[in-house]
Regions:
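Histidine/acidic residue-rich metal-binding segments in metalloenzymes
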Residues: 22-125, 141-143, 154-174, 224
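Short glycine-enriched loops at secondary-structure junctions
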Residues: 47, 129-132, 180-182
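Short glycine/proline- and charge-enriched loop/turn segments
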Residues: 9-15, 52-57, 140-150, 189-199
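Short, small-residue-biased leader/transition segments that mark boundaries at the very start
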Residues: 1-4
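Active-site loop ensemble at the mouth of alpha/beta enzyme cores that anchors a bound cofactor
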Residues: 124, 128, 132-151
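Short, acidic/turn-prone active-site loops that include or flank metal/cofactor-
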Residues: 107-112, 129-133, 202, 262-263
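His/Asp/Glu-enriched, well-ordered alpha-helical/loop segment
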Residues: 78, 82, 143-148, 157-243
Length: 283
C-alpha cells in the first residue's frame, strides 16, 4: 500500500517522510494531489513523536490544529480514502477522531470523552507496542538514546497499553501494527507484537491472533478479500510447524508462507541476530 504522511512545520517526521503544509488550503491541496496519484490512504502526523522530541512530554503535544485535521479528512473522504493518524496523547486522540480520522496509530490513555468519540465516529485504534518497548526497556547505551527519549518512550508505552485496554473494555475496535523502521523493529517480527499484546494488554492468544488477522483486515476494509481462510478470499497464509496459540514464537520460522496464492518455502529473510538476542529478553 502507498502510505503518505501529512504534517505541519516542525511536526513529527517533518522534512523526512512527511510532506509539510503551513495552511489549511495547502494541506487540502496536498491531499488532492495525493488522491490524483491513486494512493491507498492519507496519514496525518497530529502529535509530536518520541524520536524527534526535545523535551519530556513532547510526543503527545498536539501539533496539527483541528481545522486542518477536519479539512484533510473531508478532502480524503471525498475520494473514498481512509485517514490514519500518528497520535500519542488524549488531546490528540480527541482532536483526531472528532474531526474525521478513521484509525489512530499508537494511541494513549483514553477517558470517557475519547471513548465516546471513537464510538460516535466508528473509528479504530491500532496498538503498536513493538517500537516503544525497546526504547522504553532496553539499556540506553544499547540504543544510543538520551534520557529524554527513554522517559518519553516509557510514557508512550504505558499510555498505549492503558489506551488499548480501555478501548477493548468499551467496545472500540483495536488492531495491531509494528511501526517497522523504528530501532529494533523489524519487518519479520509481527509475532512479537502479538506476544506483547497478550503479555501487556492481557488478551488471550486466540484474541491476539484474530486481532492481527481478520481484525486488522476489518479495520483496513479488506475483510472481504483477506484476513481469514475462506472460499473466495485471497490465499494469504502463514503455515507453522507448531501451534502459534501455544507460543507465538512458533511463527518466527514458518514452514511456508502463501501470499496471494503464491507459495514461498525458501527462507529469504536474513535476520539481525543482535536485534533478536536483545528482543528475546523481553518475550
Amino acid at each position: 500500500s502507498d502510505v503518505y504522511k501529512r504534517q505541519v512545520p516542525n511536526g513529527h517526521m517533518a522534512g523526512s517522510v512527511s510532506r509539510v503544509a503551513s495552511s489549511v488550503d495547502e494541506a487540502v491541496a496536498m491531499v488532492e494531489d495525493l488522491a490524483s496519484h491513486n494512493v491507498d490512504l492519507i496519514k496525518l502526523m497530529i502529535t509530536g513523536g518520541v524520536m524527534d522530541a526535545k523535551v519530556k512530554g513532547e510526543p503527545g503535544i498536539l501539533m496539527m490544529k483541528p481545522d486542518m485535521i477536519k479539512a484533510c479528512c473531508d478532502a480524503a473522504h471525498k475520494h473514498n480514502l481512509p485517514v490514519a493518524a500518528h497520535v500519542q496523547s488524549p488531546d490528540g486522540v480527541r482532536a483526531a477522531v472528532r474531526n474525521g480520522v478513521d484509525t489512530i496509530e499508537h494511541g494513549s490513555v483514553l477517558t470517557s470523552h475519547e471513548i465516546d468519540a471513537f464510538k460516535e465516529k466508528n473509528a479504530s485504534l491500532v496498538c503498536t507496542l513493538s517500537p516503544a518497548l525497546p526504547m522504553a526497556k532496553f539499556p540506553r547505551e544499547i540504543l544510543g538514546i538520551t534520557d529524554v527519549v527513554q522517559y518519553n518512550s516509557n510514557v508512550v508505552f504505558n499510555n498505549m497499553v492503558a489506551g488499548a485496554k480501555a478501548a477493548l473494555e468499551n467496545g472500540v475496535k483495536v488492531g495491531l501494527g509494528t511501526d517497522t523502521g523504528c530501532p529494533y523493529t523489524t519487518h519479520y517480527n509481527m509475532w512479537r507484537e502479538l506476544k506483547y499484546f497478550t503479555k501487556y494488554v492481557g488478551v488471550t492468544p486466540k484474541f491476539a491472533l484474530y486481532t492481527a488477522t481478520l481484525g486488522n483486515a476489518e479495520i483496513a476494509g479488506l475483510d472481504a478479500i483477506t484476513g481469514s481462510i475462506e472460499v473466495g478470499k485471497s490465499a494469504d497464509i502463514l503455515v507453522a510447524d507448531k501451534n502459534p496459540l501455544d507460543d507465538f514464537k512458533n511463527m518466527a520460522v514458518p514452514y511456508m508462507v502463501v501470499a496471494r496464492g503464491k507459495v514461498y518455502k525458501e527462507k529469504l529473510v536474513k535476520k539481525y541476530e543482535k536485534c533478536e538476542t536483545e528482543l528475546d529478553k523481553y518475550c
